[in-house]
Amino acid sequence: KPSLLKEKDNVEDYADILKNLVELKLVGGETLAIKENYDLMQLAVDLDVSKNMSLRITTNGTLTPKFGGKDVFDYIPHFKDCQMTVSIEFWGEKNNYIRFPSKWGVTLENARKFADCPRTRVMFATTVNALTIGYLPEIADGVYELRKEYESNDLWSWASGSLVWGAGNEYAVTSVPLDIREMYMDKYFEYGDFMKKEFEEWKKLYYYLQDMPFDEELHKEMMTNIQLRDKHRGTCLTDVFPEWEPYYEKL
């Protein structure tokens, strides 16, 4: 049988690659919980080549552990520049529901710490799915508010990221009932800053709601999945998103 155990990388084997690298991109699982990512950054520093490369890290922003006595904040200053992409689903406490058991306060605090690092920009990124699509403008508004606190406007950015799509993917936008879509579409017109500053993005998301066909079977699968997950976690979808109440039955 094939082994399910991960073979241990010998990071030293990547020395020749690092010497010629212009961008080091680290991803997860949870990127900042993987020791080998720190070993790679340390090797780049030891080889004196980190100053020549851009560092790109995608993280949930939920933790910043130390490995060998150092955390990510110790490594960022050694690189030419850095972009931290913080993966979220909602702006604010709503994020705690999907990204259970994360805490929004911790995520935002870490994002601010990333932004305080030298030559570092922070991007918030999310997927476009049945639960998030009605609230994505709130992420844009949250980023606009953050920009007001900092001298550089390009320090903070956001991206709506990947559209959840494909056969059998119950969290696709096609699972959203038409009455909820109407509510979300009306709500989109309340986000004047987002509409004005990023109209093409606003229009793309609005048209997803308007044009994607409703799939009743996929919707039922999604609701079953949500109800089972809520039962396991001790959470409740409609406590956070009351618009789903007509379609939700607590198990």
Where are these regions (language model features)?
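Short, basic/hydrophobic alpha-helical segments
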Residues: D9-D16, R112-D116
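Core AdoMet radical
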Residues: K1-K8, L18-E36, L47-G68, Y75-E109, ...
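General structural signal for secondary-structure boundaries
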Residues: K1, A15, P177-L178
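Short, acidic, metal-binding catalytic loop of nucleotide-sugar glycosyltransferases
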Residues: L43-D48, C117
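A short acidic, amphipathic alpha-helical/loop segment
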Residues: D13, E36-L43, G68-Y75, Y97, ...
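Conserved C-terminal portion of the radical SAM core fold
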Residues: P77-T85, K103-Y248
